[in-house]
Swiss-Prot record:
Gene3D superfamilies: YheA/YmcA-like (1.20.1500.10)
Protein name (Swiss-Prot/TrEMBL): UPF0342 protein SSU05_1260
Organism: Streptococcus suis (strain 05ZYH33)
Domain of life, per lineage: Bacteria
Pfam families in the record: Com_YlbF
């Protein structure tokens, strides 16, 4: 009997959604979305991150203005307890993601 890899992937998705760390991020995200200041900072931050990623993918180096803007965003995030908690919880969840990525890609890396 063969294993259906898609069933396993769907089971993994459900397991991730049931992690306490996932639920913690989900809960604080609701709080962030309910706070107009935190929501605006987060949306602007994500938009800026996308701009920087596009520049890097195009081979461009972030300018001094970009670097200053990043520092300004970091200050705003650190000055907002909701966003500080949000990113802290994201980091905790990210540990699982990194571990899963390592496990999933192990057989593929062996083929290189």
């Amino acid at each position: 009997m063969s294993t259906n890899i898609y069933d396993i992937a769907n089971e993994l998705e459900r397991a991730i959604r049931n992690l306490p760390e996932y639920k913690a991020v989900e809960a604080v995200k609701v709080s962030v979305e309910g706070n107009s200041e935190a929501k605006e900072i987060l949306e602007s931050y994500i938009s800026f991150q996308k701009e920087i990623q596009s520049k890097l993918q195009a081979g461009e180096i972030p300018t001094e203005a970009d670097q200053k803007k990043m520092l300004d965003f970091n200050k705003k995030v650190q000055g907002n307890p909701l966003l500080t908690e949000y990113f802290s919880k994201q980091q905790q969840l990210g540990t699982y993601v990194a571990d899963l990525e390592r496990i999933i890609f192990k057989p593929l890396n062996e083929l290189l």
